[in-house]
């Protein structure tokens, strides 16, 4: 280049832009000044009602409110046609009606498979049904039945009613009926009677019968059966046998002779009440497949003839929907109580009375809204509702049970903020960039760019190092290594400290349910605090990587200017050039520094800064993926801030 006199020199630099409107963001290996900032995540609010994690892996069991074959459908339904198609339903039916088979009631073969099971049935066996059969009020039996169904369903992929058990009954008995059972009797248990003419101490023969619980029913595998062990309860021996010969007993034995259910008044006392009519009690037994025997005192034999079978192959969520009548009909709370006392069961309850559209009892708008989420897939389902947003934080603690990628409770002000808008890098403390060191721009250097930060979902993938595109731009692996090493170490420290705290909390577990709930809440809070800490580390790493990337991008821009200038300009310091005003006039300067004011600055490839936080099942309780992608684009606007400074 020709020598230049002082009078001919013009110094062109990148103008300083930082002022009081900028905020400083510190990061690993580099800092940023920014005109704006935003939280890494916003708080989400759960939607009330039911939803599912996967549309292809759930099944429902219902009645007329989910029955597409009902003549009043869809006005009679509380779900959409799409959701009704997922239900196994029949108007007038219920799982308990099919289990016991009272005379004159709907008897439907409930069966199906799904990881998540939704139960919206039960109202058809309620006080309004007025089922007697030696029992004026069946609510406590219904409660135990529904609870057992929910418990076993939560551990099984498939379930089915077994409506005909193989059995062997004694020759001396015949099918019996009862006046208070519509002159008939239940299909399960079946009543068998023995005609006897009692003499002193002689009351007929003891009944001995057998039934077999199958290992398979049709295509359904049976690892465990729910069996109703029913027996009569007498207030006194005299009520059972007025001549005083013998005591009542009805006992079920397994193949080894062990008692598994029933009542034996030979060893257990009578109630001592003053009633003259027995009542029937039914206990819910969970029995493995096999051959069982039933022994009963003369006169009466109650024989198990049905069961529900479960394959016990897969644990999954259970949702129970409150099943009540509209005005004028008496309901019970058995479904509510059963679900609330069963681990893993989410209860959906109305806040208002049931008001139907098709009639008083079918097509309630509030219930339709609560069940509308069954049309969608959620990221998280819980007792508090369902969430489909990707944010890991919610304002309120989500009540258990909960499944999926559930957000943790956090205060908005505790969520870290990341820089946004106009960004200017500082040189920071990074020493791994080697292009060359004099090229690293400090706080006195300008860059005007647009930063687009998108928070996207990612699967479990461990920690991914930032990568540099072959064509230039982005973060070098070397410049990110120290930051990633630090984030890895800090996260391990956080997790170790949290796990130690959780172990201490475990020592405080007692059998008191409230203490366990309190413990669960404390663990959730510990998880939230740890995640916020990890996000703080991620934010610092992100800021550092963006800062380094911007510095590199600025260096590439400076290199482009130097290359265009050739011998017409001398770079005297990072971002500053001296030219001869007589040799390079305004149009020449426009060509070098403003690219003729026509061609944009070549777009810098996106800054690839991805981080996947791998979830630890013990630590998080569900799979949680975070990915932060930062992209930087420089346009012709970059050059518009260049100022010309004359030096003599």
Swiss-Prot record:
Its EC number is 3.1.1.53. Disulfide bonds join 13-576, 203-245, 222-309, 230-282. One of its GO terms (molecular function) is sialate 4-O-acetylesterase activity. In natural infection, inactive HEF is matured into HEF1 and HEF2 outside the cell by one or more trypsin-like, arginine-specific endoprotease. Residues 34-151 are annotated as: Esterase domain-1. It comes from Influenza C virus (strain C/Yamagata/4/1988). The gene is HE. GO terms for cellular component: host cell plasma membrane; membrane; viral envelope; virion membrane. It is found in: Virion membrane; Host cell membrane. Residues 8-33 are annotated as: Fusion domain-1. Residues 8-623 are extracellular. Belongs to the influenza viruses hemagglutinin family. It comes from the Viruses. Changing residue 276 to N: In HMV-II adapted variant. GO terms for biological process: endocytosis involved in viral entry into host cell; fusion of virus membrane with host endosome membrane; fusion of virus membrane with host plasma membrane; viral budding from plasma membrane; virion attachment to host cell. Residues 1-7 form the signal peptide. Residues 303-357 are annotated as: Esterase domain-2. Homotrimer of disulfide-linked HEF1-HEF2. Residues 358-643 are annotated as: Fusion domain-2. Residues 151-303 are annotated as: N-acetyl-9-O-acetylneuraminic acid binding. Glycans are attached at residues 19, 54, 137, 182, 388, 545, 596. It catalyses: N-acetyl-9-O-acetylneuraminate + H2O = N-acetylneuraminate + acetate + H(+); N-acetyl-4-O-acetylneuraminate + H2O = N-acetylneuraminate + acetate + H(+). Residues 645-648 are cytoplasmic. This is Hemagglutinin-esterase-fusion glycoprotein. The active site is at residues 64, 359, 362. It is a single-pass type I membrane protein. Keywords: Disulfide bond, Fusion of virus membrane with host endosomal membrane, Fusion of virus membrane with host membrane, Glycoprotein, Hemagglutinin, Host cell membrane, Host membrane, Host-virus interaction, Hydrolase, Membrane, Signal, Transmembrane, Transmembrane helix, Viral attachment to host cell, Viral envelope protein, Viral penetration into host cytoplasm, Virion, Virus endocytosis by host, Virus entry into host cell. The keyword Signal applies.
